[in-house]
Amino acid sequence: SRYLYEAGGKRIRPVLTLLAAQLGDGNTEQVIDVAKALEITHLGSLYHDDVMDGADRRRGVPAAHAVWGNNIAILTGDILFSRASQLMSRLGERAIRLQADTFERLVLGQMHETLGAQPGDDPIEFYLQVLADKTGSLIAAATQGGVIFSNAPSEYEEPLRVYGEKIGVAFQLLDDVIDLSAKPCLLYTSDAADDSLRV
């Protein structure tokens, strides 16, 4: 389960948790547990995403499913989700609810991306909501968790949650643009972006 962790990554979620905690008591043991749990959740989601997307590589190394097969990659993601839940459960009901609500949004975002926009959906609104759920929700939880578990003033919680979600949407939007830019021939066909982004 350390394969993708050791491959690198930006660690933006734990960094934002630790930064948000500076509004309160700083990097307490609880804050550090939240930072760990949310990064572990993110790692678990990468194992699953790569299976679903059929990705060949992740963080410069072969994707886990390309090395060990789909079953092991999925089970590795599952064990990481369980370990993240164990960490959050030590922090009480508020942490459990934060993890559960975040995980629900993450899964719904992935599900909606897989299904694609339905007739009657505004494709841009649909796409942005997918980004907010799939990527923004976990970064929002990171900033929100930093506020909650550092005992920062409660008035910071919602603005920091919104801030984290917007960072997540912007990051995923940029990532999608980079993916499209790697295939310049796709950019000049009328429906290429829609097909690539499933909207």
Placement of each model-derived feature along the sequence:
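Alpha-helical phosphate/pyrophosphate-handling elements in metalloenzyme active cores
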Residues: 2-37, 126-167
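Aspartate-rich (DDxxD/NDxxD/DxxxD) Mg2+/diphosphate-binding motifs
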Residues: 5, 12, 28-77, 107-111, ...
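Inter-helical turn/loop segments and adjacent helix faces that build the functional surface
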Residues: 27, 86-98, 114-126, 144-160, ...
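Hydrophobic, amphipathic alpha-helical faces that serve as interaction scaffolds
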Residues: 81-84, 103-104
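Oxyanion-binding "anion nests"
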Residues: 164-182
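Conserved small/polar residues in nucleotide/adenosyl-binding loops
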Residues: 188-195
